[in-house]
Regions:
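Glycine-/small-residue-enriched capping loops at alpha/beta junctions
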Residues: 1-116
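Phosphate/ribose-phosphate-bearing ligand recognition and processing surfaces
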Residues: 91-184
């Protein structure tokens, strides 16, 4: 596991910011920034599908897709993570189509699936900030605020939440969000 750039205790859980390839993380579940088909795509979605192997695509094809703001869980197959939680974030349309609430729903749903499946650790990418063009700073504040709220009120066995970024430059958004919430 990479050394965290930031690590903070919130209730019973440790929240961490790391720079790493999410497909290499040995956690109970990694979150895939998926599209509604769940059949793979570019960015982190494509990387997760490639690393997990064809069995992931086969399982995803049986799920019938997923609505924006929601998530589905599959096995991790060839990944170090036991499971993949496929969260479908919103495409940014200037904030006029309920995008912040839909993004928060992705994080809540992923945490719910983690707890419902008896899992204890989860790693999130920056959902919707790539080709879906969600502003990275706003997305980081929504992600962290949602996770802190959920973990503080009802952790349900989740003891580790990792926010995983592909570069130091992108991780700064999350570090700033921690500071804005007074968690640094």
């Amino acid at each position: 596991m990479p050394t965290p750039l930031l690590s903070v205790e919130v209730g019973p859980a440790r929240l961490e910011v790391v720079v790493a390839d999410i497909t290499t993380l040995a956690v109970d579940a990694i979150v895939n920034a998926a599209n509604t088909s769940l059949l793979g795509g570019g960015g982190v979605d494509g990387a997760i599908h490639r690393a997990a192997g064809r069995e992931l695509l086969e399982e995803c094809s049986t799920l019938g897709g997923c609505a924006t703001g929601s998530a589905r869980i599959t096995r991790g197959y060839k990944l170090p993570a036991k499971h993949v939680i496929h969260a479908v974030g919103p495409v940014w349309s200037g904030g006029k189509k309920n995008e912040p609430d839909l993004l928060a729903s992705c994080y809540r749903t992923a945490l719910n699936l983690t707890a419902e499946n008896g899992l204890h650790s989860i790693a999130f990418p920056a959902i919707s900030t790539g080709v879906f063009r969600f502003p990275a700073g706003l997305a980081a504040r929504i992600a962290l605020g949602t996770v802190v709220s959920e973990i503080s009120t009802n952790a349900r066995g989740i003891d580790r939440v990792v926010f995983c970024y592909f570069s130091q430059e992108s991780a700064v958004y999350h570090i700033n969000a921690f500071a804005e919430l007074g968690l640094d």
